[in-house]
Amino acid sequence: MGHAMTAQHQSDTLLHRLNTLPPKRYGVFLLNDDYTTMEFVVEILTEIFMLGQEQAVAVMLSVHHEGKGLCGTYTRDIAQTKQQQVMQRAKAEGHPLQCIVEEI
């Protein structure tokens, strides 16, 4: 009986650990292209990602100079929603802006 209790305790401990792990985080990135205006990128960053003007400009410059810029990190569902919002807005306004989600 002692062995069964130990095995149950180990199982409960493992389950507790699994249930308390923080959710994976995902980065939402904008990718550079030759057509989307810098102003539109800043708009996206301030309106969808709620960045302040100064931070939005810094991310936009990363996109422009490094080819990719991190807009924020979120749980998977929120990251995918942000990505969809960016893609829908870009398409609606005629910009080829691309947005990707990567596990951090």
UniProtKB/Swiss-Prot annotation:
Protein encoded by which gene: clpS
Domain of life: Bacteria
Pfam family, one: ClpS
Protein family: Belongs to the ClpS family.
Subunit structure of this chain's protein: Binds to the N-terminal domain of the chaperone ClpA.
Gene3D superfamilies hit by this protein: 3.30.1390.10
InterPro entries the record matches: ClpS, ClpS_core, Ribosomal_bL12_C/ClpS-like
The species this protein was found in: Neisseria gonorrhoeae (strain ATCC 700825 / FA 1090)
Name of the protein: ATP-dependent Clp protease adapter protein ClpS
One GO-annotated biological process of the protein: protein catabolic process
Main function: Involved in the modulation of the specificity of the ClpAP-mediated ATP-dependent protein degradation.
